Amino acid sequence: MVVYLAFGLLYSVTTPLFEASDELWHYPFIKRLADGDGLPVQTPDQIGPWRQEGSQPPLYYALGALLTRWVDTSDMEVLRWINPHADIGVLTRDRNVNMVIHTERERWPFSGAALAVYLVRWMSVGLGAVTVLAAWLTARELAPGNRWLPLAAGAITAFNPMFLFVTASVNNDALVIALCAVCLWLMVRYVRGEPRPWHWALLGGLLGLASLSKASALGMLALAAATGAVVGWRTRHTPAGGWRALLVAGVGIAVPLVTIGGWWYYRNWLLYRDPLGLNAFVAIVGPRHPVPTLRQLLGEWQGFVMSYWAFFGGVNVAAPRWVYWALSLLGGAGLLGMALHVWRLVRARERD
């Protein structure tokens, strides 16, 4: 954990301001909330400096605003001097990769908007530490008594170059990943244990917070439902088991989830007639024409792999090719090991 924090802080102070993925758009959302201007209403004819990120659920931005509201950030537009010639999202020979033009305002000692950005970056590093801890706890739950597997799970999570890069920047992914990782750990515990009603309420509350961090967290609801189903099936021969356990799980999760996150999706419905707000998001960022086919998406597999492992800057600073090969081989070995482990478990159960 100490090594992760050291690397995370190093990434946070060496990555130039606004040169980390969509940090250029994430931070203005935080500044708007810190200035007391409230949540933006997204329209394609009035695009704010937060662009499409203003359509994102607001929890991460609200936390960043609370952390930095005391900082005078009136110099943000001077600091955020956009480079009109930057090659964003593509690899080019001219290497014009800087999304902004950098000035002396970024130098130590930090002040103004630069200080605010670094404070939020350090908050993200802390959230990354929560993710690493949750990975360690999940592996320990899955393999009790195994000293090395939890350590390996934490290390693989912590030292993924892209994970370090994202969790050392202003990015709501840092919060949603941390919350989902904790939820995953709890679900593994519940499958193996005997969860009580308050356990389900805790899971529902965390899922509600995750849904207020990024809409993609709603995908965790399928895992939560599966967890409740497994617990119900495993306890079906007990008085409080079976359908009763499934009902307790469903209500326990749904009530805090809707209470915490429901208002955001209702607001989206009122404003955009889309609970996820995706139509407003796409109207600003622009739709893809033509709609890609499955074959085209498979043809972009290399880009997906690169962006998972190490694709820095504005998705325009790549690592050497051998890095992707090495990391992909490591990931492939992990998948092979998982398949082998499952096969051994099945064989052991057949023998029993």
Task: Give the ranges of each region predicted by the language model.
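Interfacial juxtamembrane loops and adjacent helix segments
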Residues: 32-121, 286-288, 315-319
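Membrane-interface alpha helices of multi-pass inner-membrane proteins
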Residues: 199-215, 220-221
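Short helix- or helix-capping micro-motifs
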Residues: 4, 153-158, 207, 211
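Membrane-lumen/periplasm interface segments of multi-pass, membrane-embedded glycan/lipid transferases
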Residues: 269-348
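Transmembrane signal-anchor helices characteristic of membrane glycosylation enzymes that use polyprenol
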Residues: 1-24, 34-50, 70-80, 84-85, ...
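Membrane-interface transmembrane helices that cradle and orient dolichyl/undecaprenyl
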Residues: 140-144, 183-199, 210, 232-234
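Start-transfer (signal-anchor) and selected internal transmembrane alpha helices
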Residues: 1-9, 119, 127, 132, ...
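Perimembrane helix-loop-helix junctions
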Residues: 186, 192, 220-255
